[in-house]
Protein backbone atom coordinates (compact mmCIF):
# COMPACT_ATOMS: atom_id res chain seq x y z
CA UNK A 1 0.00 0.00 0.00
CA UNK A 2 1.31 3.48 -0.91
CA UNK A 3 2.29 5.69 2.01
CA UNK A 4 -0.15 8.33 0.78
CA UNK A 5 -3.04 5.88 0.89
CA UNK A 6 -1.88 4.62 4.28
CA UNK A 7 -1.74 8.19 5.60
CA UNK A 8 -5.23 8.93 4.32
CA UNK A 9 -6.63 5.71 5.77
CA UNK A 10 -4.85 6.50 9.02
CA UNK A 11 -6.54 9.87 9.14
CA UNK A 12 -9.94 8.35 8.34
CA UNK A 13 -9.41 5.62 10.92
CA UNK A 14 -8.47 8.14 13.56
CA UNK A 15 -11.63 10.11 12.97
CA UNK A 16 -13.73 6.93 12.86
CA UNK A 17 -12.12 5.61 16.02
CA UNK A 18 -13.86 8.21 18.15
CA UNK A 19 -16.53 5.58 18.80
CA UNK A 20 -13.95 3.33 20.46
CA UNK A 21 -11.74 5.97 22.03
CA UNK A 22 -14.44 8.48 22.85
CA UNK A 23 -12.41 9.93 25.73
CA UNK A 24 -9.52 10.92 23.45
CA UNK A 25 -10.79 11.67 19.95
CA UNK A 26 -8.30 12.68 17.27
CA UNK A 27 -8.06 16.32 16.24
CA UNK A 28 -10.66 17.43 13.75
CA UNK A 29 -9.22 18.14 10.29
CA UNK A 30 -8.49 21.82 9.75
CA UNK A 31 -9.32 23.49 6.45
CA UNK A 32 -8.86 21.66 3.14
CA UNK A 33 -7.10 18.29 3.30
CA UNK A 34 -5.33 16.24 0.60
CA UNK A 35 -6.88 13.48 -1.45
CA UNK A 36 -5.29 10.03 -1.65
CA UNK A 37 -3.74 10.86 -5.03
CA UNK A 38 -2.30 14.12 -3.69
CA UNK A 39 -0.77 12.34 -0.71
CA UNK A 40 0.81 9.75 -3.00
CA UNK A 41 2.19 12.51 -5.20
CA UNK A 42 3.57 14.56 -2.29
CA UNK A 43 5.36 11.60 -0.77
CA UNK A 44 7.54 11.31 -3.92
CA UNK A 45 9.10 14.76 -3.24
CA UNK A 46 11.62 14.53 -6.14
CA UNK A 47 10.59 13.74 -9.72
CA UNK A 48 12.01 14.14 -13.21
CA UNK A 49 11.10 15.86 -16.45
CA UNK A 50 12.38 14.71 -19.85
CA UNK A 51 12.10 17.37 -22.55
CA UNK A 52 12.68 15.64 -25.87
CA UNK A 53 11.39 16.43 -29.37
CA UNK A 54 12.48 18.03 -32.65
CA UNK A 55 13.86 20.96 -30.63
CA UNK A 56 16.60 18.62 -29.41
CA UNK A 57 17.90 18.57 -32.98
CA UNK A 58 17.13 22.14 -34.14
CA UNK A 59 18.62 24.05 -31.23
CA UNK A 60 15.32 25.76 -30.44
CA UNK A 61 13.43 25.93 -27.15
CA UNK A 62 10.01 26.47 -28.74
CA UNK A 63 9.62 24.90 -32.18
CA UNK A 64 7.63 26.97 -34.67
CA UNK A 65 5.62 23.97 -35.86
CA UNK A 66 7.08 23.77 -39.36
CA UNK A 67 9.89 21.37 -38.48
CA UNK A 68 10.18 18.34 -40.75
CA UNK A 69 9.51 14.97 -39.14
CA UNK A 70 12.83 13.82 -40.60
CA UNK A 71 14.65 16.06 -38.11
CA UNK A 72 13.85 13.66 -35.28
CA UNK A 73 16.46 10.91 -35.45
CA UNK A 74 18.23 10.03 -32.18
CA UNK A 75 21.31 7.98 -33.01
CA UNK A 76 21.36 5.64 -29.98
CA UNK A 77 18.06 6.03 -28.14
CA UNK A 78 18.12 4.19 -24.82
CA UNK A 79 14.99 4.52 -22.70
CA UNK A 80 16.53 2.17 -20.16
CA UNK A 81 19.49 4.49 -19.60
CA UNK A 82 17.21 7.50 -19.17
CA UNK A 83 15.00 5.75 -16.61
CA UNK A 84 17.97 4.19 -14.85
CA UNK A 85 19.70 7.54 -14.37
CA UNK A 86 16.44 9.02 -13.07
CA UNK A 87 16.06 6.18 -10.58
CA UNK A 88 19.71 6.36 -9.49
CA UNK A 89 19.26 10.10 -8.94
CA UNK A 90 16.48 9.31 -6.46
CA UNK A 91 13.59 10.43 -8.63
CA UNK A 92 10.31 8.62 -8.08
CA UNK A 93 8.57 9.62 -11.32
CA UNK A 94 9.52 10.70 -14.83
CA UNK A 95 7.33 12.98 -16.95
CA UNK A 96 7.86 12.92 -20.73
CA UNK A 97 7.03 15.77 -23.12
CA UNK A 98 4.89 13.60 -25.37
CA UNK A 99 4.01 16.68 -27.42
CA UNK A 100 5.55 20.13 -26.96
CA UNK A 101 4.38 23.42 -28.49
CA UNK A 102 5.76 22.43 -31.92
CA UNK A 103 3.05 19.76 -32.17
CA UNK A 104 5.42 16.85 -32.94
CA UNK A 105 4.20 13.65 -31.25
CA UNK A 106 6.61 11.17 -29.70
CA UNK A 107 4.08 8.39 -30.25
CA UNK A 108 2.47 7.29 -33.55
CA UNK A 109 -0.78 9.16 -33.02
CA UNK A 110 -3.69 8.15 -35.22
CA UNK A 111 -4.78 11.77 -35.54
CA UNK A 112 -1.74 13.44 -37.12
CA UNK A 113 1.10 12.66 -39.49
CA UNK A 114 3.38 14.99 -37.54
CA UNK A 115 4.88 12.26 -35.36
CA UNK A 116 7.58 9.65 -35.00
CA UNK A 117 5.82 7.45 -37.56
CA UNK A 118 7.11 9.76 -40.31
CA UNK A 119 10.61 10.12 -38.90
CA UNK A 120 13.64 8.03 -39.92
CA UNK A 121 14.04 6.84 -36.32
CA UNK A 122 13.25 3.12 -36.04
CA UNK A 123 12.26 3.41 -39.74
CA UNK A 124 9.01 5.02 -38.68
CA UNK A 125 8.02 2.19 -36.35
CA UNK A 126 9.25 3.70 -33.08
CA UNK A 127 7.27 4.89 -30.08
CA UNK A 128 9.19 6.96 -27.53
CA UNK A 129 6.26 7.05 -25.12
CA UNK A 130 5.99 3.26 -25.11
CA UNK A 131 9.72 2.74 -24.57
CA UNK A 132 10.00 5.35 -21.80
CA UNK A 133 6.86 4.18 -19.98
CA UNK A 134 8.05 0.57 -20.03
CA UNK A 135 11.54 1.55 -18.89
CA UNK A 136 10.04 3.53 -16.01
CA UNK A 137 8.03 0.54 -14.84
CA UNK A 138 11.12 -1.67 -15.06
CA UNK A 139 13.07 0.77 -12.87
CA UNK A 140 10.23 1.18 -10.37
CA UNK A 141 9.43 4.73 -11.45
CA UNK A 142 5.99 6.21 -11.93
CA UNK A 143 5.29 7.67 -15.38
CA UNK A 144 3.75 11.03 -16.23
CA UNK A 145 2.76 12.73 -19.47
CA UNK A 146 3.10 16.31 -20.73
CA UNK A 147 0.77 17.21 -23.61
CA UNK A 148 1.04 20.85 -24.66
CA UNK A 149 -2.38 22.48 -25.10
CA UNK A 150 -0.79 24.95 -27.52
CA UNK A 151 0.00 23.37 -30.90
CA UNK A 152 1.87 25.59 -33.38
CA UNK A 153 1.67 22.91 -36.08
CA UNK A 154 -2.07 22.21 -36.13
CA UNK A 155 -4.09 23.94 -38.83
CA UNK A 156 -7.19 23.91 -36.62
CA UNK A 157 -5.63 25.40 -33.48
CA UNK A 158 -7.90 28.18 -32.23
CA UNK A 159 -11.10 26.51 -33.50
CA UNK A 160 -13.46 24.09 -31.69
CA UNK A 161 -12.11 21.26 -33.87
CA UNK A 162 -8.76 21.48 -32.10
CA UNK A 163 -10.30 20.67 -28.71
CA UNK A 164 -11.66 17.43 -30.16
CA UNK A 165 -8.23 16.70 -31.66
CA UNK A 166 -6.48 17.45 -28.37
CA UNK A 167 -8.78 15.21 -26.35
CA UNK A 168 -8.38 12.38 -28.83
CA UNK A 169 -4.61 12.57 -28.43
CA UNK A 170 -4.94 12.80 -24.66
CA UNK A 171 -7.15 9.70 -24.69
CA UNK A 172 -4.53 7.81 -26.71
CA UNK A 173 -1.96 8.56 -24.02
CA UNK A 174 -4.28 7.87 -21.09
CA UNK A 175 -5.43 4.51 -22.44
CA UNK A 176 -2.41 3.12 -24.27
CA UNK A 177 0.55 3.32 -21.90
CA UNK A 178 -0.37 1.81 -18.57
CA UNK A 179 -0.79 3.70 -15.28
CA UNK A 180 -0.22 7.46 -15.53
CA UNK A 181 0.66 9.19 -12.27
CA UNK A 182 0.72 12.81 -13.45
CA UNK A 183 -0.75 14.79 -16.34
CA UNK A 184 0.99 18.10 -17.02
CA UNK A 185 -0.91 20.97 -18.68
CA UNK A 186 1.41 23.84 -19.64
CA UNK A 187 0.17 27.40 -19.29
CA UNK A 188 1.89 28.67 -22.46
CA UNK A 189 -0.72 29.05 -25.19
CA UNK A 190 -1.58 31.20 -28.18
CA UNK A 191 0.81 33.20 -30.36
CA UNK A 192 2.55 32.92 -33.69
CA UNK A 193 3.07 29.59 -35.39
CA UNK A 194 3.03 27.50 -38.55
CA UNK A 195 -0.61 26.43 -38.11
CA UNK A 196 -0.76 24.18 -41.17
CA UNK A 197 1.01 26.72 -43.37
CA UNK A 198 -0.94 29.83 -42.36
CA UNK A 199 2.14 31.22 -40.56
CA UNK A 200 0.20 33.69 -38.49
CA UNK A 201 -0.55 34.72 -34.94
CA UNK A 202 -3.57 33.21 -33.24
CA UNK A 203 -5.04 34.33 -29.93
CA UNK A 204 -7.40 32.32 -27.75
CA UNK A 205 -9.28 33.00 -24.53
CA UNK A 206 -7.34 30.69 -22.25
CA UNK A 207 -10.08 30.83 -19.61
CA UNK A 208 -12.72 29.31 -21.87
CA UNK A 209 -11.21 27.93 -25.08
CA UNK A 210 -9.90 24.63 -23.76
CA UNK A 211 -13.06 23.81 -21.76
CA UNK A 212 -10.88 22.49 -18.95
CA UNK A 213 -13.64 20.93 -16.82
CA UNK A 214 -14.41 18.37 -19.53
CA UNK A 215 -10.73 17.70 -20.23
CA UNK A 216 -10.14 17.15 -16.52
CA UNK A 217 -13.12 14.78 -16.45
CA UNK A 218 -11.47 12.81 -19.25
CA UNK A 219 -8.35 12.33 -17.14
CA UNK A 220 -10.44 11.30 -14.14
CA UNK A 221 -12.32 8.77 -16.27
CA UNK A 222 -9.27 6.96 -17.64
CA UNK A 223 -6.65 7.59 -14.93
CA UNK A 224 -8.47 8.37 -11.66
CA UNK A 225 -5.29 8.34 -9.54
CA UNK A 226 -3.34 10.66 -11.85
CA UNK A 227 -2.58 14.07 -10.39
CA UNK A 228 -3.31 16.95 -12.74
CA UNK A 229 -0.88 19.87 -12.89
CA UNK A 230 -1.60 23.38 -14.15
CA UNK A 231 -1.51 26.94 -12.87
CA UNK A 232 -4.84 26.11 -11.25
CA UNK A 233 -4.50 22.43 -10.46
CA UNK A 234 -6.89 20.80 -9.70
CA UNK A 235 -4.33 18.61 -7.89
CA UNK A 236 -0.97 20.39 -8.21
CA UNK A 237 -0.14 24.04 -8.78
CA UNK A 238 2.79 25.72 -10.51
CA UNK A 239 5.20 27.37 -8.08
CA UNK A 240 5.22 30.60 -10.09
CA UNK A 241 8.76 30.43 -11.49
CA UNK A 242 11.02 28.09 -13.45
CA UNK A 243 13.94 28.42 -11.03
CA UNK A 244 12.84 25.56 -8.78
CA UNK A 245 12.37 27.80 -5.75
CA UNK A 246 9.30 27.77 -3.50
CA UNK A 247 8.30 30.73 -1.38
CA UNK A 248 8.88 30.97 2.33
CA UNK A 249 6.30 30.34 3.55
CA UNK A 250 4.89 28.05 0.88
CA UNK A 251 1.39 27.11 2.04
CA UNK A 252 -0.11 23.87 0.75
CA UNK A 253 -3.42 25.67 0.14
CA UNK A 254 -4.69 28.10 -2.49
CA UNK A 255 -7.96 29.81 -3.42
CA UNK A 256 -8.24 27.90 -6.68
CA UNK A 257 -11.28 29.81 -7.92
CA UNK A 258 -9.00 32.81 -8.54
CA UNK A 259 -6.86 30.92 -11.07
CA UNK A 260 -7.07 29.18 -14.43
CA UNK A 261 -4.41 27.52 -16.62
CA UNK A 262 -2.38 30.22 -18.34
CA UNK A 263 -3.57 32.90 -15.92
CA UNK A 264 -0.93 32.95 -13.23
CA UNK A 265 -0.38 35.27 -10.29
CA UNK A 266 3.20 34.16 -9.79
CA UNK A 267 3.62 35.67 -6.34
CA UNK A 268 0.52 33.98 -4.94
CA UNK A 269 1.36 30.67 -6.59
CA UNK A 270 4.82 30.85 -5.06
CA UNK A 271 3.56 31.28 -1.52
CA UNK A 272 0.02 29.90 -1.60
CA UNK A 273 -2.95 31.34 0.29
CA UNK A 274 -3.50 31.27 4.03
CA UNK A 275 -6.25 30.52 4.65
CA UNK A 276 -6.93 28.75 1.37
CA UNK A 277 -10.03 27.02 0.06
CA UNK A 278 -8.26 24.13 -1.71
CA UNK A 279 -5.40 21.75 -0.93
CA UNK A 280 -3.11 22.52 -3.89
CA UNK A 281 0.58 21.82 -3.21
CA UNK A 282 3.28 23.41 -5.34
CA UNK A 283 5.55 21.78 -7.89
CA UNK A 284 8.93 23.45 -8.50
CA UNK A 285 10.04 22.97 -12.10
CA UNK A 286 13.62 23.73 -13.10
CA UNK A 287 16.10 22.39 -15.64
CA UNK A 288 19.52 20.94 -14.91
CA UNK A 289 20.70 23.06 -17.85
CA UNK A 290 19.99 26.68 -18.86
CA UNK A 291 17.49 25.44 -21.46
CA UNK A 292 14.72 22.88 -21.26
CA UNK A 293 15.96 20.92 -24.27
CA UNK A 294 19.45 19.56 -24.80
CA UNK A 295 21.83 21.92 -26.63
CA UNK A 296 25.52 21.00 -27.08
CA UNK A 297 26.67 24.55 -26.34
CA UNK A 298 25.29 24.18 -22.78
CA UNK A 299 27.38 21.13 -21.87
CA UNK A 300 29.55 23.32 -19.66
CA UNK A 301 26.59 24.90 -17.87
CA UNK A 302 25.08 21.85 -16.15
CA UNK A 303 24.06 22.60 -12.57
CA UNK A 304 26.53 21.29 -10.01
CA UNK A 305 25.60 18.83 -7.26
CA UNK A 306 25.90 21.68 -4.75
CA UNK A 307 23.48 23.83 -6.76
CA UNK A 308 21.04 20.93 -7.03
CA UNK A 309 21.22 20.36 -3.28
CA UNK A 310 20.47 24.04 -2.67
CA UNK A 311 17.41 23.72 -4.91
CA UNK A 312 16.31 20.65 -2.98
CA UNK A 313 16.31 22.63 0.26
CA UNK A 314 14.48 25.53 -1.45
CA UNK A 315 11.74 23.29 -2.87
CA UNK A 316 11.27 20.02 -0.99
CA UNK A 317 12.52 21.80 2.11
CA UNK A 318 9.65 24.28 1.88
CA UNK A 319 6.90 21.72 1.43
CA UNK A 320 6.88 21.54 -2.37
CA UNK A 321 7.96 18.86 -4.85
CA UNK A 322 11.09 19.29 -6.97
CA UNK A 323 10.55 18.61 -10.68
CA UNK A 324 14.01 18.53 -12.27
CA UNK A 325 14.33 18.48 -16.04
CA UNK A 326 16.96 16.07 -17.41
CA UNK A 327 16.77 16.43 -21.22
CA UNK A 328 18.02 13.55 -23.37
CA UNK A 329 20.72 14.48 -25.87
CA UNK A 330 20.80 13.92 -29.63
CA UNK A 331 21.71 10.28 -29.05
CA UNK A 332 18.57 9.84 -26.98
CA UNK A 333 20.37 9.42 -23.66
CA UNK A 334 21.12 11.52 -20.58
CA UNK A 335 24.39 13.28 -21.39
CA UNK A 336 27.42 12.22 -19.28
CA UNK A 337 27.94 15.47 -17.32
CA UNK A 338 24.23 15.60 -16.47
CA UNK A 339 24.26 12.00 -15.28
CA UNK A 340 27.39 12.57 -13.21
CA UNK A 341 25.88 15.63 -11.50
CA UNK A 342 22.68 13.72 -10.75
CA UNK A 343 24.46 10.75 -9.19
CA UNK A 344 26.63 12.96 -6.99
CA UNK A 345 23.54 14.93 -5.97
CA UNK A 346 21.93 11.64 -4.91
CA UNK A 347 25.04 10.61 -2.98
CA UNK A 348 25.07 13.90 -1.06
CA UNK A 349 21.40 13.59 -0.11
CA UNK A 350 21.95 10.03 1.06
CA UNK A 351 24.96 11.11 3.11
CA UNK A 352 22.81 13.67 4.92
CA UNK A 353 19.49 11.90 5.41
CA UNK A 354 20.49 8.27 5.90
CA UNK A 355 21.29 8.85 9.58
CA UNK A 356 18.68 10.53 11.77
CA UNK A 357 20.32 11.65 15.00
CA UNK A 358 16.95 12.39 16.59
CA UNK A 359 16.23 8.68 16.85
CA UNK A 360 18.70 8.56 19.78
CA UNK A 361 16.66 10.98 21.88
CA UNK A 362 13.92 10.72 24.45
CA UNK A 363 10.96 12.95 23.62
CA UNK A 364 8.72 14.82 26.05
CA UNK A 365 6.08 17.47 25.48
CA UNK A 366 4.41 20.25 27.43
CA UNK A 367 1.03 18.77 26.48
CA UNK A 368 -0.11 15.44 25.02
CA UNK A 369 -3.64 15.08 23.76
CA UNK A 370 -5.65 13.40 26.50
CA UNK A 371 -2.35 12.02 27.82
CA UNK A 372 -2.95 9.24 25.30
CA UNK A 373 -0.15 7.05 23.99
CA UNK A 374 -1.40 7.40 20.42
CA UNK A 375 -0.55 11.14 20.50
CA UNK A 376 2.64 10.90 22.55
CA UNK A 377 5.74 12.99 21.92
CA UNK A 378 7.79 9.92 20.95
CA UNK A 379 5.77 9.63 17.73
CA UNK A 380 7.90 12.36 16.14
CA UNK A 381 11.01 10.16 16.31
CA UNK A 382 9.54 6.72 15.54
CA UNK A 383 10.42 6.84 11.83
CA UNK A 384 6.77 6.56 10.79
CA UNK A 385 4.75 9.05 8.77
CA UNK A 386 1.35 7.76 9.92
CA UNK A 387 1.81 8.69 13.60
CA UNK A 388 2.00 12.12 15.19
CA UNK A 389 2.20 14.15 18.37
CA UNK A 390 -0.91 16.20 19.08
CA UNK A 391 -2.08 18.45 21.89
CA UNK A 392 -5.46 19.00 23.48
CA UNK A 393 -7.96 21.19 21.68
CA UNK A 394 -7.31 24.78 22.63
CA UNK A 395 -3.60 24.17 23.26
CA UNK A 396 -2.15 25.87 20.21
CA UNK A 397 1.20 26.92 21.69
CA UNK A 398 3.23 23.93 22.85
CA UNK A 399 6.78 22.66 23.28
CA UNK A 400 8.36 19.32 22.48
CA UNK A 401 11.86 18.56 23.78
CA UNK A 402 14.34 15.95 22.55
CA UNK A 403 16.80 14.95 25.29
CA UNK A 404 19.92 13.01 24.27
CA UNK A 405 21.92 10.67 26.51
CA UNK A 406 25.07 12.34 25.17
CA UNK A 407 25.59 15.44 23.01
CA UNK A 408 25.01 15.21 19.25
CA UNK A 409 26.20 17.49 16.47
CA UNK A 410 23.76 18.47 13.71
CA UNK A 411 23.35 21.20 11.11
CA UNK A 412 20.20 20.08 9.25
CA UNK A 413 16.70 19.63 10.65
CA UNK A 414 13.52 18.21 9.12
CA UNK A 415 9.99 18.79 10.39
CA UNK A 416 6.73 17.33 9.12
CA UNK A 417 3.08 17.84 9.97
CA UNK A 418 0.43 15.13 9.51
CA UNK A 419 -1.17 16.14 6.17
CA UNK A 420 -4.48 14.21 6.46
CA UNK A 421 -5.46 16.64 9.23
CA UNK A 422 -4.61 19.71 7.13
CA UNK A 423 -1.89 22.33 7.47
CA UNK A 424 -2.17 23.57 11.05
CA UNK A 425 1.02 25.32 12.17
CA UNK A 426 1.47 29.02 11.37
CA UNK A 427 4.55 29.74 13.45
CA UNK A 428 7.39 27.68 14.94
CA UNK A 429 10.94 27.87 16.20
CA UNK A 430 13.48 25.07 16.60
CA UNK A 431 16.06 25.66 19.32
CA UNK A 432 19.10 24.01 20.88
CA UNK A 433 20.27 24.23 24.49
CA UNK A 434 23.65 25.97 24.59
CA UNK A 435 25.56 27.88 27.22
CA UNK A 436 22.73 27.51 29.71
CA UNK A 437 20.01 28.92 27.46
CA UNK A 438 17.83 28.13 24.46
CA UNK A 439 19.18 29.46 21.16
CA UNK A 440 17.34 29.53 17.84
CA UNK A 441 18.43 27.16 15.08
CA UNK A 442 15.54 27.75 12.66
CA UNK A 443 12.05 29.17 12.55
CA UNK A 444 9.28 30.23 10.25
CA UNK A 445 5.58 30.11 9.51
CA UNK A 446 4.82 26.98 7.47
CA UNK A 447 5.82 23.37 8.08
CA UNK A 448 3.32 21.35 6.06
CA UNK A 449 4.46 18.20 4.28
CA UNK A 450 8.16 18.90 4.87
CA UNK A 451 10.30 21.66 6.29
CA UNK A 452 14.10 21.52 6.01
CA UNK A 453 16.51 23.88 7.70
CA UNK A 454 20.28 24.21 7.36
CA UNK A 455 22.56 26.04 9.72
CA UNK A 456 25.93 26.12 11.41
CA UNK A 457 27.13 23.05 13.28
CA UNK A 458 25.40 22.71 16.65
CA UNK A 459 26.49 20.40 19.47
CA UNK A 460 23.89 19.93 22.18
CA UNK A 461 22.08 17.40 24.35
CA UNK A 462 18.66 19.09 24.07
CA UNK A 463 16.57 20.34 21.15
CA UNK A 464 13.20 22.06 21.49
CA UNK A 465 10.41 22.59 18.97
CA UNK A 466 8.11 25.43 19.95
CA UNK A 467 4.81 25.82 18.13
CA UNK A 468 4.27 29.55 18.55
CA UNK A 469 1.19 30.08 16.38
CA UNK A 470 -1.61 27.81 15.20
CA UNK A 471 -5.37 28.26 14.78
CA UNK A 472 -5.94 24.73 16.16
CA UNK A 473 -3.94 22.14 18.04
CA UNK A 474 -0.78 21.05 16.16
CA UNK A 475 -0.19 17.56 14.76
CA UNK A 476 3.54 16.99 14.21
CA UNK A 477 4.63 13.77 12.52
CA UNK A 478 8.41 14.13 12.51
CA UNK A 479 11.40 15.93 13.95
CA UNK A 480 14.63 14.77 12.31
CA UNK A 481 18.19 15.94 12.92
CA UNK A 482 21.02 15.31 10.48
CA UNK A 483 24.61 16.25 9.76
CA UNK A 484 25.82 17.59 6.40
CA UNK A 485 29.55 17.38 5.82
CA UNK A 486 30.75 20.59 4.21
CA UNK A 487 32.93 20.65 1.09
Describe each PLM feature range:
Residues 17-20:
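N-terminal signal peptide c-region/cleavage motif recognized by signal peptidases
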Residues 428-430:
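Short beta-strand elements bearing conserved aromatic residues within extracellular beta-rich modules
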Residues 10-13:
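Sec-dependent N-terminal signal peptides
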Residues 456-468:
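Noncatalytic modules at the cell exterior or secretory-pathway interfaces
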Residues 478-487:
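Short beta-strand-to-coil "C-cap" segments at the C-terminal boundary of structured domains/repeats
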Residues 418, 433-435, 484:
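Inter-blade boundary loops/turns of WD-repeat beta-propellers
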Residues 23-381, 387-396, 401-402, 409, ...:
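Mature catalytic domains of secreted/periplasmic carbohydrate-active enzymes
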Residues 1-8:
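Bacterial N-terminal signal peptides that target proteins for export
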Amino acid sequence: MHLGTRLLLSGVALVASTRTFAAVPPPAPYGPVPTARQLQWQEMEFIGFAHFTVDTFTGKEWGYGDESETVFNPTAFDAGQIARVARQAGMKELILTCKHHDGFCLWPSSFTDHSVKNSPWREGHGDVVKEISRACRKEGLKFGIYLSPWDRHSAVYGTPAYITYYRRQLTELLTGYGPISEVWFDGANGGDGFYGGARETRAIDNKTYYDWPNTIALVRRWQPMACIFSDAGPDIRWVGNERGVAGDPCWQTLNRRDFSPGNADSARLNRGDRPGTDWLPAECDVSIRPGWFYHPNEDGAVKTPAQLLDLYFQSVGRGATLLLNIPPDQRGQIHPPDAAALLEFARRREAIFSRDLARRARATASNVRGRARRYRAENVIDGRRDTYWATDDGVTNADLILKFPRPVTFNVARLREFPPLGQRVEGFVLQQWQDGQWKDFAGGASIGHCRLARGADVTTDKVRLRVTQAPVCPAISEIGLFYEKKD
